A protein has these predicted regions:
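Nucleotide and nucleotide-moiety/phosphate-recognizing core
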Residues: 2-161, 166-185, 190-192
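Hydrophobic helical membrane-anchoring modules
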Residues: 199-201
């Protein structure tokens, strides 16, 4: 059985945040505190330890007491670049990933993804959300993966491909559908930030 001590949490804070005017999203105030603090609070009970993937504000992120790792690829290459360095530093059998700007992520994210992982002996399990209209949307940056996937990911990245769903298709992967799409809401615009603060007040 996969337990908390088997999982390292990786918070992805390495993006450009172009739609937010280039502001470092993890440090944007949310209810008066940097967004990343909500991500840390949600992940901490679900994992053994946390690692933060960031490409700027390194000193600030380091004040939270966790290791801060930078992408090894240039020009803000996306979540797979963060996955890659996360796997490289992971010392537990599993890595759980989440972006820094989704403050409402499920308290049982690790538990449900781990149960599916064990059910089908998968290499990676990602979250999906059921929207109000009944459609199911993949939420691939919320995923639990085996920490021995670094070679697979490196080979994929060496082909010049950065599409997260295409890498998933090369693996034994599955998904868990969450009924509340709000738990994966993230911040891409000031309007979305305001809306998230309202629904989580």
């Amino acid at each position: 059985m996969i337990s908390t001590k088997d999982i390292t949490g990786l918070i992805l804070a390495g993006g450009r945040a172009q739609r937010m005017g280039g502001i470092d999203k993890g440090l944007i105030p949310f209810h008066g505190k940097p967004l990343i603090e909500s991500a840390i609070a949600k992940l901490k009970p679900q994992v053994q330890t946390i690692v933060i993937n960031a490409n700027r504000s390194i000193t600030k992120y380091a004040t939270y007491g966790y290791a801060v790792i930078m992408d090894e690829t240039p020009d803000f290459s996306g979540p797979l670049a963060g996955f890659s360095v996360g796997l490289k530093t992971c010392k537990t059998p599993y890595l759980l990933t989440s972006p820094c700007d989704s403050p409402l992520l499920p308290n049982n994210l690790a538990e449900l993804l781990a149960a599916e992982m064990e059910r089908g002996d998968f290499q990676l399990v990602y979250a999906s959300s059921k929207e109000v209209d009944g459609k199911v949307w993949a939420q691939p940056v919320f995923c639990l993966m085996r920490s021995n996937l670094q070679d697979s990911l490196n080979q994929f990245l060496q082909k010049g491909d950065l599409k997260i769903d295409r890498w998933f298709k090369e693996l034994r992967s599955s998904t868990v559908i969450f009924d509340d799409p709000q738990v994966f809401a993230n911040v891409n615009t000031p309007e979305e930030l305001k809306k998230l603060e309202e629904v989580s007040a």
